[in-house]
Amino acid sequence: MSLPKKLEEMQVEEASKLAQNLREILDRWSKLYYTKDAPEVEDYEYDEKYADLVALEEAFPEIITQDSITQRVGGEILEGFTKVTHTEPMLSMGDVFSRDELVEFDNRIQKNVGHPVDYNVELKIDGLAISLIYQDGELIQGSTRGDGNIGEDITKNLKTIKSVPQKLTRPLSIEVRGECFMPKASFAKLNAQQLEDGKPVFANPRNAAAGSLRQLNTNVTKKRDLDTFIYTVVDSNQLGAKTQHQAIQMMAELGFNTNPTQEVCANLDEVWDYIAKYEGQREDLPYGIDGIVLKVNDLSLQQELGHTVKIPRWEIAYKFPPEEAATVVRDIEWTVGRTGVVTPTAVMDPVQLAGTTVSRATLNNVDQLTAKDVHIGDTVLLHKAGDIIPEITRVVLEKRPVGISELDIPTHCPSCGKELVHLNGEVALRCINPDCPAQIVARLEHFGSRNAMNIMGLGPKQIQQLYAKNFIHHFDDLYKLTSEELSQLDGFKEKRVNNLLEAIDNSRKNSLERLINGLGIQGVGTKMARTLAEKFGTMDNLMQTTIEEFDAVDTIGETLANNLATFFQSDVAQNMIDELKAVGVNMEYLGVKPAESPDGYYKGKKVVLTGKLEQYTRNELKERLISLGADVAGSVSKKTDILIAGADAGSKLTKAQALGIEILDETEAIAKFEQ
């Protein structure tokens, strides 16, 4: 499933609904793939959906959930593998994408240590991070990164890899870390065998390596021809090395496979020459790389610089620009969203692009489709926006077939058949039929989603089945569902039926802002729903509010004020609210109003959250901060007062550091609740 529209055109509630749907699908596929070696879908389908989820969560960080598959650094801890607590956390790296960002990194290093430094520059191998522990020279444990603190014991699988030494050349007790990967030749051989066996092929070498290494059957791993590069030792004192470069050389002498391409660079000009050299040789290397890693060479300076809760301060990853690939458009599909917007998506021949197989790309709207002049049968060039979202760059006109058909822009809704319109000069094509089946289903899906009424266990699949059986049509119908009706859903036995009935019943008690969000009012997302609930307190008050009163609220403009007044004063809304009242849905705001917030540390401050949290989910921490008077935003700017950074924070942390914004880790942030 490609995203139905551009990220910047989405409302947060729409993004949340899409993301939750993707999480449920990916969780099921991932378990089948990793624990049973029995994938339900081809890898490129998994990759597409995973890329969509990553893009949504990066654009709308407030929708990230602690259990999201994207928040597991190395995935879930699988049943059948023993959990391993790392002696030192296996931290992630910060990413940069330009020379200017490398200059900023170098400036920070020089400012902190007081002088220029040498860098050891290494290729960023596209594989799976591993840890190896040796006692008296004997391999006693190998593990995956896992969530960074706890990984999986895969010692038996790692022992099947030829480049992992069972015994070192010296009887040392050390822990080293590196990357397990599948060489390109091995990947081609594996996929050829998969095809011969009638099994789906792997989308890319990294996925193949990860799936092969995390097998419950070690014989499967042994046949997959994996390899390793070791690049760090946890305690460099055990080797007596003074520099990163020297440590890698010493690890090679111990019997580890290390990458010979590392170089010591005295300045950024030399670093950039290294980048240019290997970016040009990227396709010729026998293994996959997606960038280079820049590390302060002096190990004592690494210790001095230290790390944040999530990333070392002494290293950075430079990611290569997105690749382009050519493919052929075979169809253009039109889908209908919750608000009636009809979106075109190009369906293409599958093609490898930046490490994944791509077969779909959204064209967002008719104007973009016509501006890019995309026709069925065209050869197009693709790239990945942000290395995540597949996007058509342009049509290769010289390859356009003679007599190609003209663009077929729909004039009627593909779901209900009613005529499509452009409202108020909108670019989007829109179906304005309130009884359009696709819109009804999408509205119901949104109503039950995590950021709206949060009815756990009620996903798109269940909504679609309930609608198809004519059990639900309006929001209040959800609260009239019976156990007999729910038992007709696929996979619903007594326990699952009871759990869903309980979740539906619990949603009646939600605070008003969730209901407002669930109603799907144009221009109203999670944040605006809370503003309305805090300001007006009850649904009855909202129903009686005029355009002028809405417009008087600081964060509400004239257009939104008109939308709100039109909606709440309509007969449709009145009937909808009356029906929801009749089934016992709460109509009052239950949270703390801003005026009632304590005069504490966060009162009146603009706060941004980033990275993975341990003690709170993102939404829980956001709710707590709001109750303390904070204004929680989604992006870092000069107006940001505080950045709360969990594990694996990325560009927001880098930007906050550059702007001199106060940065707190989760523990520090929680400690200030009482200040």
Swiss-Prot record:
The gene is ligA. GO terms for biological process: DNA repair; DNA replication. It comes from the Bacteria. One of its GO terms (cellular component) is cytosol. One of its GO terms (molecular function) is metal ion binding. NAD(+) binds at D43, Y44, E45, Y46, D47, S92, M93, E122, R145, E179, K295, K319. It catalyses: NAD(+) + (deoxyribonucleotide)n-3'-hydroxyl + 5'-phospho-(deoxyribonucleotide)m = (deoxyribonucleotide)n+m + AMP + beta-nicotinamide D-nucleotide. Its EC number is 6.5.1.2. PROSITE patterns: BRCT, DNA_LIGASE_N1, DNA_LIGASE_N2. Pfam families: BRCT, DNA_ligase_aden, DNA_ligase_OB, DNA_ligase_ZBD, HHH_2, HHH_5. Belongs to the NAD-dependent DNA ligase family. LigA subfamily. Zn(2+) binds at C413, C416, C431, C436. The active site is at K124. Residues 597-675 form the BRCT domain. Keywords: DNA damage, DNA repair, DNA replication, Ligase, Magnesium, Manganese, Metal-binding, NAD, Zinc. DNA ligase that catalyzes the formation of phosphodiester linkages between 5'-phosphoryl and 3'-hydroxyl groups in double-stranded DNA using NAD as a coenzyme and as the energy source for the reaction. It is essential for DNA replication and repair of damaged DNA. This is DNA ligase. It comes from Pediococcus pentosaceus (strain ATCC 25745 / CCUG 21536 / LMG 10740 / 183-1w). Signal peptide: none annotated. Its cofactor is Mg(2+); Mn(2+). SMART domains: BRCT (SM00292), HhH1 (SM00278), LIGANc (SM00532).
